[in-house]
Amino acid sequence: IICTALIILGLTSFSVAEEQVELLPEVKELITPKPLDTKLLENNRFIALLGATYAKDDYYNVTKTAFAKDYAAIYEALPEVNMLSSEEINQIALELNKLDYSKGLLQWQDPKNFIKINLLCFEYNNSHCIDQIIQNQSKIQQLLKDNETLIQRYDDVFRDYPIAHTLFFPREASIMTPLPAYQNLLSIMKAQLANSVVLISEGKVDQGIETLLLLQRRINQMVYLEQKNNLIDVMIAGAMQQILDQYLDALLNSQYAEQLLQHPEFSALMLAGQDYAKQIHPTTLIALKHESQLAFVWFKPVLASHDLSVVELNDYYVKKSELEALYQVNPYDPTTQKLVRELCKDVTNTLLMMDCRNSIWEVGYLERNDIQRDYHNMVYLKYLIMKHQVQDEDIPEFLKSQGDLAIDPISQQPFVWNSKERSISLSGVQYKHLPATIRRTMQNDAHLKTLQIVIPNKL
């Protein structure tokens, strides 16, 4: 949508004969800016996260009021034909920016960049990460103490606001809608994951698992189907799940594995992870569809300036709707891919062509989350094999019995058991679709990659 916006703002006008045709009702709904629905300001985790770093206890009401004022100011200022520039929007929407300075912010305190420098189990297949965490337990616990207020704030947000509904500023201001401080979520998670290992190592297994379960439920909240997430939210959830999965994999390789496997709450944790596995794919599809439709918010002033005809826009909407419907059913079907390639062939309007060629569906967001889910499922399968003591010779049949849980949705290839390496793997994965933590350990070359986890020898 950002690329489309810049292209539209930068192009000069040209004349297209307007047909005497009405806009499709669905198109009119998409392109018409609307006043803010104030009901969406209530009990909304998006607003809570947006204001989570505001230091005062009334952070939610303050943020809600500021967002509403900025939205209303932009809405009232929207011209019929021309578009507001980013400079004009910044001069109009002032209330949220004021919050950064008037009362101060809750900021992540890590002056020595411990979390950034010490990747710990954030590094893919680091066989020593559990020991490294235990060696650094005093630094980890100090980090938690220094950030106690910020951590409590985010705990409160997810406890009090289970549902998120992303709100965008109207029309061209949509690309300038402020977003939550996602880096805080990641930093807090990394510190709490490391502390869960410390707790388990100290014999406080209940507390360690409770921390892990809290984080898994937090991720699950971010991919609930009953909410309207933006695409960034969904991708952040996938990144958080990858980190958690790597910690679980490391714990299953550690000296604490048997104790965890016998703990009922650890079983509850692993089952909670399957809620994420069931929801991440459809949630990503919904977010992609919403992101794709956001491109239409730009087209009302373009229609008014006669740079685009009603016929062209109606036809383009129908084509994109066909594509989106196929993606919702089976995005990896050859028919869908063929339609993607052919969608732009009959599109002649320059503005529509730019949006068509930069389709959000082709960037790889869905593939990244599906590959992450593959890794997540591998860790879950590893847990099941260890929990139920599946014998090596029975593992191939066990994997087959798990159905889609052991099949990559992109290639439809099954996971493979290698008895010599004691690994479950998936080969032929594109580097660009791997989670960021895994890409760090693999060379970016033309060769397809192998995703895998290793089953330790019998406990």
Features from the language model and the residues they span:
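Classical Sec-dependent N-terminal signal peptides that target proteins to the secretory pathway
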Residues: 1-18
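Short acidic linear motifs
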Residues: 14-459
